[in-house]
Amino acid sequence: MNTKAMLETLNEITLLVDEPLKNVTFTKTGGPADVLALPKTKKEVEEIVAYCREQGLSWLVLGNASNLIVRDGGIRDVVIMLTEMKEIKVAGTTMIVDAGAKLIDTTYEALAADLTGFEFACGIPGSVGGAVYMNAGAYGGEIKDVFQSAEVLLADGTIQTMTKEDLNFRYRHSEIQELHCIVLQATFALEKGNHAEIKAQMDELTELRELKQPLEYPSCGSVFKRPVGHFTGKLIQDAGLQGLKWGGAQISEKHAGFIVNIDHATATDYVELIAHIQEVIKEKFDVELQTEVRIIGEEV
């Protein structure tokens, strides 16, 4: 990749060369991206994708890098991170939100407008684009419950509006995962509610999260999808794995469904510990755990 030419051509866009992705991931692990692009507008995203297409460069998108592990060898693609695109607009009972906006911020803007429906997401640390990508959910709610449409940039450079039907949401999945495209903005349909009741529910869910989840350590959030008929955390507990340390990573003593970075863990520590958990759970209970966390990048 000719990074000098890219910097010269896209000189108005923030481009970081050989940027360690441990600086942006919630696990505080991960190798460097050859180029990390931080667009501030839809137009800048279009320009980056157009340049990559013209030069034959591959690209990928990161949301808030919360439910993500980047391997220690890093990423050779152009990495596009949308955290600078974070406008949140409210129009009646509709919210129009840039993909890089934090989901937590979005829920509190809904509260400020006395809008109900987003309470379930008040503690989910991801971005709005990432939440649409994986149909994020918690405490009985999912993004699909409030989703109306998304503005998406396709790989060929065209922008398309996709509906709930188009995205075919299911558990921790949307059609965005099958398409090489970028969520630029999402529209959500909420309802008018009582401010005090909305706040009380959000406070209750926040308290639950703080009580049950290891928020005091870096982590990638929930590591595994919930297998049918089981609770992942209980399987890991019953297997005697809770508290297991692997390098600088550890299965949380607070919630066995989380792996925390307790001592300068590497992405390799995380990936190997995940594989070990999967192997043990398969052997003991004949249950195959599938990762919810997205694992990308190259080995060292």
Curated annotation (Swiss-Prot):
GO MF: FAD binding; UDP-N-acetylmuramate dehydrogenase activity
Organism superkingdom: Bacteria
Keywords: Cell cycle, Cell division, Cell shape, Cell wall biogenesis/degradation, Cytoplasm, FAD, Flavoprotein, NADP, Oxidoreductase, Peptidoglycan synthesis
Pathway info: Cell wall biogenesis; peptidoglycan biosynthesis
One BP term from GO: regulation of cell shape
Keyword ATP-binding annotated: no
Protein's cellular compartments: Cytoplasm
Ranges where the FAD-binding PCMH-type domain occurs: 28-193
GO CC annotation terms, alphabetical: cytosol
Function of the protein: Cell wall formation.
Protein name as catalogued: UDP-N-acetylenolpyruvoylglucosamine reductase
Natural source organism: Enterococcus faecalis (strain ATCC 700802 / V583)
